[in-house]
UniProtKB/Swiss-Prot annotation:
GO cellular component: cytoplasm
GO biological process terms, semicolon-separated: eukaryotic translation initiation factor 2 complex assembly
Name of this protein: Translation initiation factor eIF2 assembly protein
Keywords: ATP-binding, Chaperone, Cytoplasm, Magnesium, Metal-binding, Nucleotide-binding
Main localisation: cytoplasm
Amino acid sequence: MTDYAKFEEIDLTVEEVLNCSFSKWAPLFPKNVFPYKIIAPLPDGFIDYVQSDGIKLPSAKTNKIVLEQNSDNEYSDWEDVEDIENDTGEVEEMHSESQKNYEEKEVLEASGHFPQLNQEITQSIAELGGKVIPKLNWSSPKDASWLMPGNVIKCTEVDDVLLLLKSSDHVIDDLAYPFLEVSQLPEDETRKNGQDRIKVDYELVLKQWRDLNPALEFRVFVKEGKILGISQRDLNHYDFLKELEPQLKENIQLFVTDKVVNKLNASLPNLTKFIVDVYVPRPFDKIYIIDINPFLRKSDSLLFTWNELLTADPDSDTVPFRLINETNVGAFAKKQYSESQVPLDVIGAAQDHEALIELAKEWEKLQSKEAEEEDEAVVVDGVIEEK
């Protein structure tokens, strides 16, 4: 017989979500956060740009993106070149003119829309040592790290920052549905077309990039001033953590209870529950705050389930401290944020049998077309030409 657990509601308020914005809590812990810059408020046009389809970046080098001529984007002026191929000069002139027209059509000028903001970002990056990690009020674009060299969200120029923001599902979700899990919105702030009408002053946070050891990052769940659980943040097995567990657990508990909770209670009394990510570098005598997030289900509960956290006894003398060990490493052996690296067509097909069949048919057609094109190609004097 299957045991069913009651779905536990999270009584989350708008104010609690807003108080987890970086600019609300970071200034309270000047000695426990890495150097950062906040650019705020962000103009509405920039928010629309981040949420818009397509990616247009203000390249610092050329301010343009040019698509090369190929079979997928043929330009009409290239037609009938064979009819005048004997006139080399005319062909070259036609090629030059058509290429110029083509480039003018495809040049994408994005920097002109937000020149001041781009300048602020560039200046902030320089002041922070030339390497930064971007984020908005709540989420950082970790799910888009696969677009960056080394799979690391380390930005050295404006283009890097914008690429990550526009490619991140986490960032887009924060912009479109920041209060989706709020239990009760104010009466005059009901949702319209699925989006919240509450005005949010969005901010761009640039944090100085540090090469952190992921094994020493931990997530702490706090409710009503009590720690419900502590979880390893990176879901890989590290042998050395087991012997450090008592020391790490004690240090994290003391820091969160004595410093984080007390400071937030004094400055942000309405923030009664939250999730704090901490970094505990060797020699373990100082702890840094990476982020403070709203206490909601879209935040990863890692080695806990949300039902465990919501039904935990806050007055218990024992705080669960969970690590990936040799026996449970397989349970979490998946690529993190892999769902953000798959085309929407594939995700939709996985949930719809008919869509899956249609996707398979389209893929088969594409494969057949490519095979036919390869069969029609011949090699003449070392050059591939069409038959």
